[in-house]
Curated annotation (Swiss-Prot):
Top EC class, one word: ligase
UniProt KW Membrane keyword: no
UniProt superkingdom: Eukaryota
Protein name: RNA ligase 1
Record's comment on post-translational modification: AMPylates itself (auto-AMPylation).
Organism: Pongo abelii
GO biological process: hematopoietic progenitor cell differentiation; response to reactive oxygen species; RNA repair
Lineage per the UniProt record: Eukaryota, Metazoa, Chordata, Craniata, Vertebrata
InterPro entries referenced in this protein's UniProt entry, alphabetically: RLIG1
């Protein structure tokens, strides 16, 4: 699988942004909007945005595959957040007029405890061996997804550690107009980040599965490249999102040659998300499990078993996949 950038921290917007004092369409109870101006940001220019690879920004929750207990494991995103006292100090600092000075964090005392198995995200700055919080006062990180952890039950539904495989959605290797759901060795995904999408994630913007029969999948970051993107101008991108089938996506992530990731979200352009008919649901999808060795070894209720029952079947769109349980 071709590897692009890894999502280990929040991505900056391709445009310089400004805050407008009107209710957010992205977050309930947020009294302001963050909107893109027409100026491309210095971060984007420094990362050579014009030579970057544009890909679909997928709406789910971020995951990571790395080693745990001497085998490839799926990890869930868990950001360490400040305790109440530290959060209050930080908010006062942000709202003060004399905020030219840098805020001082005491990582050992200011943050809520993390699970023992927690690891900080890669690429974040460290001082004296301690990770430095981001501009929101969070320390991005990961925790391994254990099989019986109810908190991460939807994460664990897409992996099988006995056979070291994961359920992955990507383009069919021989037909870019066809999507494919397959069981991929976790070892092929090592050190990659992916997006978990499905019934119980982020309000299910792609309409996958049902409450009775939930369906979740992993999508490698950068899996869906955008072929005919217009010029990097505010109005051209706005027209593209509004006017063509390929633009019916949450946003764009540019994978830059230096590993930097730059994004634009529909909300940055004043557009709504989620939307009724997404581009992801406009393409046919085929099931290709290729699991002859372990056909009879799965729990009858698990996702892998459900997909084996419809192996090699083709559906007009992802929404049409219904398990006959």
């Amino acid at each position: 699988m071709k590897r692009l950038g890894s999502v280990q921290r929040k991505m900056p917007c391709v445009f310089v942004t400004e805050v407008k004092e009107e209710p957010s369409s992205k977050r309930e109870h947020q009294p302001f909007k963050v909107l893109a101006t027409e100026t491309i940001s210095h971060k984007a220019l420094d990362a050579d945005i014009y030579s970057a690879i544009p890909t679909e920004k997928v709406d789910g929750t971020c995951c990571y595959v790395t080693t745990y207990k001497d085998q490839p494991y799926l990890w869930a995103r868990l950001d360490r957040k400040p305790n109440k006292q530290a959060e209050k100090r930080f908010k006062n600092f942000l709202h003060s007029k004399e905020n030219a000075k840098e805020f001082f964090w005491n990582v050992e005392e200011d943050f809520k405890p993390a699970p023992e198995c927690w690891i900080p995200a890669k690429e974040i700055e460290q001082i004296n061996g301690n990770p430095v919080p981001d501009e929101n006062g969070h320390i991005p990180g990961w925790v391994p997804v254990e099989k019986n952890n109810k908190q991460y039950c939807w994460h664990s539904s897409v992996v099988n550690y006995e056979f070291e495989i994961a359920l992955v959605l990507k383009h069919h290797p021989d037909d870019s107009g066809l999507l494919e759901i397959s069981a991929v060795p976790l070892s092929d995904l090592l050190e990659q980040t992916l997006e978990l999408v499905g019934t119980n994630i982020n309000g299910n913007p792609y309409g996958l599965g049902s409450k009775k029969h939930p369906l979740h999948l992993l999508i490698p970051h950068g899996a869906f490249q955008i072929r005919n993107l217009p010029s990097l101008k505010h109005n051209d991108l706005l027209s593209w999102f509004e006017g063509c089938k390929e633009g019916k996506i949450e946003g764009i992530v540019w994978h830059c040659s230096d590993g930097c990731l730059i994004k634009v979200h529909r909300h940055h352009l004043g557009l709504c998300w989620p939307i009724p008919d997404t581009y992801m649901n406009s393409r046919p999808v085929i099931i290709n499990m290729n699991l002859n060795k372990c056909d009879s070894a799965f729990d009858i209720k698990c996702l892998f078993n459900h997909f084996l029952k419809i192996d090699n079947q083709k559906f007009a769109r992802l929404k049409d996949i219904i398990f006959d349980v």
